[in-house]
């Protein structure tokens, strides 16, 4: 799922992931961006958008952010919500996302 993201290339294929909620409902998401936060926070991050999301009246789409840990073979992993009070983590994610969007 994860890859080094050096922000100097375009994705030709969409990377998709299926999330399952507490009720067992599956939702398909597109991986918008992965962020290597191992050095600073000891974990990596992923930004997701619903795969078939349409922009709202303001031209925006809901983006979800999670920290993640891959399993040893790199095919799956565990997503964890990022605590709302993790201000330094959110600041880093916002900074990387803004740089990504400027490209």
UniProtKB/Swiss-Prot annotation:
It holds the Pfam family DUF1292. It comes from the Bacteria. PANTHER family: UPF0473 PROTEIN CBO2561/CLC_2432, UPF0473 PROTEIN CBO2561_CLC_2432. NCBIfam families: PRK13678.1-2, PRK13678.1-4. Belongs to the UPF0473 family. This is UPF0473 protein SGO_2040.
């Amino acid at each position: 799922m994860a890859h080094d993201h050096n922000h100097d290339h375009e994705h030709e294929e969409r990377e998709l992931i299926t999330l399952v909620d507490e009720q067992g409902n599956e939702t398909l998401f597109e991986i918008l961006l992965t962020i290597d936060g191992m050095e600073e926070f000891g974990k990596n991050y992923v930004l997701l958008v619903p795969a078939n999301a349409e922009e709202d009246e303001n031209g925006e789409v809901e983006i979800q952010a999670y920290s993640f840990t891959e399993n040893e073979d790199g095919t799956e992993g565990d997503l964890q919500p990022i605590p709302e009070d993790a201000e330094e983590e959110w600041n880093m994610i916002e900074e990387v996302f803004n740089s990504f969007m400027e490209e």
